[in-house]
Amino acid sequence: MYAVCECRTRGIVGVGESPYLCIVKQIKRRKMKRIVFAIALFLSFGLGYANNNVRTIKAPRFARPLVEKWIEEYAKTQPGVEFQIVKGQTESDLSVTIADQQEAVTDNFCHLLYIGETAVLPITARSSEAARLLEGKHLNAKKLKQLFFLGDEFDDEVKNKAFERIIVYSGSNASSVASSFAHNFGEESTNFRGKRIAGDDLFLNTAVAKDPLGVTFNTLSNIFDLQSRHLKSELSLVGLDLKKDVANSFNGTLDEVLTILENTKPAEVAVEKVGITFNNNDEAVRRFLQWVLENGTKYNHQYGLLNLNQKVAEAQTDKVQSKLTAQK
């Protein structure tokens, strides 16, 4: 009688309905609660398992297409571990960085492996007033310093009033190649003339496209079309004082530029190593790095990066293999 009253009180069974119906409904409710609990537990376990098998990578814009290719190809060999690119202030398991910026990431990572090099060239908008002013100049390192940086210490022989009309655009983002370009000429990134552009270095291309007097600089992967392998149609390289064979290569395809810069390093061109910073306590990360060094670097040219020389490349492979061995 109590069970029937309780059922009626809870609204499980109505007046006049069989008490057995009440019992059946109670059993069904209890079973449903168990099923819901089991599903929640399963989903919670599955989510935790998925999170444990996800690793994250940060990469500057110029290297992002290459990293995306690594992730795509690595997934074919190791489907149990997923690597994802993250942006902004989000923490990551790995970070692709220019060697010149290594100090900025040492607080979060304790190891660095080099995977290639990036080259930075001065550019302006095609057929712009800046391109006209710089036409035929063939600037050496000294004249490039005068064009891009503040300072009154330059010799009279390199002073050029035409330079004073030109507006320099440089990146202010922490991952910008501005510091690499500046350090190549013995300068600091705080000493650029002109205007600073926040955000991705790709915005530098947009800035000079809008300003007829604008000049800037960027990585090869940002100034060449990775599909056609030619300089982007809206851009023009600033003429540099280079040896004839180097200058001829700069008039060719991206692959010609990469090849010549792997064999010679003109003072007028900023070339910096690109590396991956990481912690050494994750076997999945170390195995991914081993794959990158053995298989991923073959995509360097495709995505606008120079290859390391053989000695440096072998040293990186030895480094990651020793870390894998040490963990066994």
Regions found by a protein language model. Give the residues of each.
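General secretory precursor processing signal
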Residues: 8-10, 25, 186
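Bacterial Sec-dependent N-terminal signal peptides
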Residues: 3, 20-55
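Residues that line or immediately flank small-molecule/substrate-binding pockets and catalytic motifs
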Residues: 39, 99, 220
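Exported/periplasmic ABC-transporter solute-binding proteins
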Residues: 50-78, 86-88, 111-118, 123-328
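Residue-identity detector for glycine
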Residues: 6, 11-16, 46-48
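Short, Φ-rich (hydrophobic/aromatic) sequence segments
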Residues: 16, 23, 288-289
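Pocket-flanking alpha-helical
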Residues: 89-110, 223-227
